[in-house]
Amino acid sequence: MKITTLKKAAVAFAAVGALALTVAAGPASAEMKEQEFRVVGTWGFLDHWKEREGPFWNERLPKLSGGKLTANAKSQTELGLSGYEIMRLLKLGVFDAVHGVTTYVAQDSPAIEGADLAGVIQDLPTYRKANEAYRHILAREFEEKYDAKLLMIYAWPSQQLFCNLGDKSVTEYGLDKLAGKKIRTYSTTLGDFIAGVGGTAVTIAFAEVVPALQKGVADCGLTGTLPAYNAKWWQVVTHNIRIRLGYASSFLAMNLKKWNSLDEETQNFFKAQLAPLEEEMWAATAINDQRGMDCNAQGPCDTQVGNMTAIEPTAADKVMLQSVVENFVLKRWAKRCGTQKCVDEWNATIGKISGMKAAL
């Protein structure tokens, strides 16, 4: 996809999103209670925060509510947070609402982790369909484990491998060659994938990955295509191995006590405004996935190209991925899940859509 096409697509979905946000609900009534929300977004240097999360809370919400609803919204980067702690802080009432990645907050609920098991789905439309089918399970788990109201689900560009192989002229590098490599991960399920290919998982927060790759703490890293570009991974790695392991299932949740304190008009106002924002998120993810791959490699790109060597998965890689998913990812997750109900719910939703099956 050419960069001009990407720009046109971006303008189109932004215009649709802005229009939807304008017409989704009428203006707030004079009786709506004035209040400010304490909000944490995702990473401050990435696209979702800069173009959607931040502008929604700091600009759109006040404008669309006639100044009744405002927010003190900051990215987790600005607050010095890693993302792993945000749901526990939300439960404590430190914040009113948080954006986050499901696998970052699945410590207390393997069922939440089930939304984004590594390697199960390799295309975004199917991934979204699966997450929608699983939404009610996520909503229940957020309420029961974290006293939180799930308000939105979205995703990031596909999670792929980025490795420093030392020589950019290398054009063939299969999953079978990852054995013995130290690979950055951010979730247990990605760690299961790494174990399946014979690598060593190294858990590193996103903001700390570039120095870790630079110093050899990790040989490779897993993240989204555009996040890797925006974080300048191309300065410290040589190759992008384009095996898709998921799309970093993400969410917006509000403290349940705070949500329940809102009157019906305010709750409905939020629902009406967040629905089109969620559509914007998914549309942006589709565009940014390709943009990230292009910019990390040889372009086209509207900024500096990363000059990584791109390696597409072979038929043998796809066979190996299937085996790793079945024998490591699903088996280990089912064991963490621990109950037949948990496994059955996944099989009836994401499993049914993906054609995969988990078993205790």
Which residues does each predicted region cover?
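Bacterial N-terminal signal peptides that target proteins for export
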Residues: 2-14
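N-terminal secretory/targeting leader peptides
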Residues: 11, 15-17, 30-125, 149-360
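Sec/Tat signal peptide C-region and signal peptidase I cleavage site
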Residues: 23-30
